[in-house]
From Swiss-Prot:
Protein name: Large ribosomal subunit protein uL22
Signal sequence segment: none
Function: This protein binds specifically to 23S rRNA; its binding is stimulated by other ribosomal proteins, e.g. L4, L17, and L20. It is important during the early stages of 50S assembly. It makes multiple contacts with different domains of the 23S rRNA in the assembled 50S subunit and ribosome. The globular domain of the protein is located near the polypeptide exit tunnel on the outside of the subunit, while an extended beta-hairpin is found that lines the wall of the exit tunnel in the center of the 70S ribosome.
Keyword Electron transport attached: no
Gene: rplV
Family designation: Belongs to the universal ribosomal protein uL22 family.
CC annotations in GO: cytosolic large ribosomal subunit
PANTHER family: CHLOROPLAST 50S RIBOSOMAL PROTEIN L22-RELATED (PTHR13501), LARGE RIBOSOMAL SUBUNIT PROTEIN UL22M (PTHR13501:SF8)
InterPro entries in the record: Ribosomal_uL22, Ribosomal_uL22_bac/chlpt-type, Ribosomal_uL22_bac/org-type, Ribosomal_uL22_CS, Ribosomal_uL22_sf
GO BP, sorted A to Z: translation
GO molecular function, one term: structural constituent of ribosome
Length: 110
């Protein structure tokens, strides 16, 4: 079985939120997966769709695979780098805020 990979690294969303969307399309055909992502109102859906479209383009251009036969064989979301930020609070105190990122990996295959 031929598998083609696309990675979106450093996506500006937490891995926990992106996994909710990734779970929706795992194992689906790419046409059905794109349909699900188009009608999802989550921010992560836009990012996952971008990675999926990249994987489809890689399969079509680099490996000459037929798009109609492709399905999402594997999709996983790993934690990326976290940016540490400071939120000033009352009486001279400060809280730490972590702006989380993630790496989205999509594999499509026949």
């Amino acid at each position: 079985m031929m598998e083609v990979t696309a990675k979106l690294r450093g996506a500006a969303i937490s891995a926990q939120k992106a996994r909710l969307v990734a779970d929706l399309i795992r194992g689906k055909s790419v046409a059905h997966a794109l349909n699900i992502l188009n009608f999802s109102n989550k921010k992560a859906a836009v990012l996952v769709k971008k990675a999926l479209e990249s994987a489809i383009a890689n399969a079509e251009h680099n490996n000459s695979l037929d798009v109609d036969d492709l399905k999402v064989s594997t999709i996983y979301v790993d934690e990326g780098m976290s940016l540490k930020r400071i939120m000033p609070r009352a009486k001279g105190r400060a809280d730490r805020i972590t702006k989380r990122t993630c790496h989205i990996t999509v594999k499509v295959g026949v």
